[in-house]
């Protein structure tokens, strides 16, 4: 009923309906065609479906016009992920699911929004064509089977030639939000004489991550 509009609605409502439908369609591949071996890799279902829904909507907008859905994603979904990642209950995207109670708690902003955000970074890191080629080979190799994180990483490495071990450890297996701050000196004339970008990590998760500034 929520998505059967009976009157004029906002563009945000249309976007929400679109990405919900695209998310569920994505599960035909991420979840149905290939299913994770255990709930540790729940993100292989949900993060991918989340990313795929916004990626597909962005392609539609490029072809037919409309607002970039990644703007809405950054304002709403990514903010949800940031918020949950600063709570005591945060966990890695690729989490250690010790039992089914842990699984139920991890259908959250980390698994959906932060996972999709990190996948967007991964696409930029390996290149979109390489990423899609690697995912295609992942489906071909494991169709109607069960997988884990290493299976996907192998295909992405084969397609891109990029070493993904550091990316995996710092972004997928380490929780928490790092902070980037400007540190600078200004002379008497108001000119910047030094400008550095300093990264800090939460005390609970003291891991610095590679960033590209642009």
Could you tell me what each predicted segment is?
Residues 1-204:
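Hydrophobic alpha-helical and helix-loop surface patches within well-folded domains
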